[in-house]
Amino acid sequence: MAEAGLPCISPMRLHKKLGRAVPYLRALVERMVTWPTEGAAERWGGYVFAAVDATVVCGPGAVGTDARIHTKLRIADVSLDEVQVTDEFGGETFRRFAWHPGELAVADRAYFTAAGIQHVLDASADVLVRYRLGSVDLSDADGDPIDVLVAVAHLAVGEMLDLDVVAKLPGGMAPGRLIAHRLPDEAVERARARLRQEKGAELSARVFESAKYVLLFTTAEHARLDADRCLRGYRLRWQIELQFKRWKSLCGFDMLPNQRDDTTLAWIYAKVLLGLLLDRMASIPTELSPPERHDAVGNLPSDVVRSLEAHDHRVAAPRRRTHVVRAA
């Protein structure tokens, strides 16, 4: 910094300044975000819509993966409630975060574990999470086990299922719902292609079959969130995840300044703000492109000229090029 003519700041002082900047950066991000109404509580049965996710990053001086950033994000205002930095082996679980009554924890299938769901329910919050085969035992009201693939096999393309189930958790049996949506054939083929690439020879027949569906588990009551709204809510989480992956590529999310949670929080807000600014600039192409070529005044329609002059905008006559003939 000193070489660039800027003040010389010690690492500790810079760390403290970043910590104090969090409220300011958060406020800037909240002002810049363009989807606040999408995550508003009134659209989701009064729930505070909170998405959790983890992303792999590199620490300073690293040549490979050596850290994960775990985030809890309020979708309504893109407020980061919690950020944790772990080594590359830090698992994805709801238990990393504190939960509060009225929150809806939304996450992908990595978070579908009995202990994680129990942690959220113990805080009087609810979950909306992608279902994963074999992770949590589900049964019907009579206690009979439910084979999820059998339960959804009758669905035609585009059809949905909203099935009351009971989940076996560490604290006992908890009521919930299985939400299923049969995907179009094109989407099924794309999902299966990703599974072949990710799992290779380890891909099981049941997982291959499950690619036909979007399968969700929720503890939210039907009166608050019906099946369609659950699917739309999960889709919103997925869209925001894609947006963050794009920002990660554009803004250098993959290089941590250090592995302190508080510094990383300010750093992430600054990166998100940069991503929002880039998106805002990209949405105004006329300001970034060369100015448009305007017609000469002499080519303007006479009624346009009269209108301009009537509002005290005197229009100068076009300059005429004169040719001077010099005597030989």
What are these regions (language model features)?
Residues 1-49, 55, 317-318:
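Gly/serine-rich nucleotide phosphate-binding loop at the start of the catalytic core
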Residues 9, 13, 18, 29, ...:
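Single, function-defining residue in the core of a domain
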Residues 51-52, 106:
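Short hydrophobic beta-strand that contains or immediately precedes a catalytic carboxylate
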